[in-house]
Amino acid sequence: KKNNIIEIITHKKLYQFLILFRRATLVALLFLSKDYLFAESFKVRALWIVRDFMTTQDKIDEVVSFAENNNYNHLFVQIRGRGDAYYDSKLVPRSHLLNNSNFDPLEYILNQTRGTHIRVHAWLNTYYLWSSPQKPSQNDHLLLQHSDWLDTKVPDEMNVSHMLDKMEKDRKINGEGFYLAPTHPEVEAHLQNIITELLQNYRLGGIHFDYIRYHDIGWGMNPTGLKFFLNYTNGMPGLPVIKIQEKPSFSDFK
């Protein structure tokens, strides 16, 4: 029993430390010198390249040519759209829009800009996983393989087929579609592995994280994530879900 009490206290202290650390980091960023923050602002001319322009060599050549001719020096190229990859990956299924199985769009654009003034950044839709009412064509897509990783408004198992059927009838039913749950530990580990793989295999100018958020207000109730929160806060026995959502500690956790 004594060990259990010590473990609970340790968890609470760790949880409190993480919250304080995040707040302190934000405050520190706000007080950084504006001269430091904006010293390079006029030297950066950037383009965001959506994944539709990353599907063939011809399209990429057009992008690079436009950037060079108009003095753009940073390209944020979208290589993760809806839980898929526009690069060679052992972790993420290849986009169905890439017809040539031997073509690596990210490697190609890096090669085409080598020796130029252009830096290529990887642009990822981080938690946004799927938006179509139709199932992904890739059998190894996370929507089909790990429905338990999806975010939800209520702490119940996500029925993907049922949600897709409802979206087919009314696109407003599920909003933007499906998101991964930021509160799920395995989701965080998976995303970290994706970033590690990119950094190990490609010489990138940087990584641009898009959709690094929840689906909307009221989301964040993935069952596994909720259990993780309750363990760190010593639980809230018998407390209705709606009351847990109102707790400031739950907002901090999210």
Predicted regions and their residues:
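Conserved, mostly hydrophobic/aromatic
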Residues: 75, 113, 191, 198, ...
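Boundary at the C-terminal end of the N-terminal hydrophobic targeting segment
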Residues: 37-41
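Hydrophobic faces of well-ordered beta-strands that scaffold small-molecule active sites
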Residues: 45-49, 75-77, 120-122, 207-209
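Active-site-proximal loop/short-helix segments
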Residues: 130, 136-138, 169, 203-254
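Catalytic domains of carbohydrate-active enzymes, especially glycoside hydrolases
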Residues: 59-84, 202
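Aromatic-lined substrate-binding rim segments of carbohydrate-active enzymes
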Residues: 83-125
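Active-site-adjacent "subsite" loops/lids of carbohydrate-active enzymes
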Residues: 42-46, 54, 127-197, 201
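Acidic-and-aromatic substrate-binding clefts and catalytic sites of carbohydrate-active enzymes
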Residues: 50-59, 80-85, 99-100, 128-129
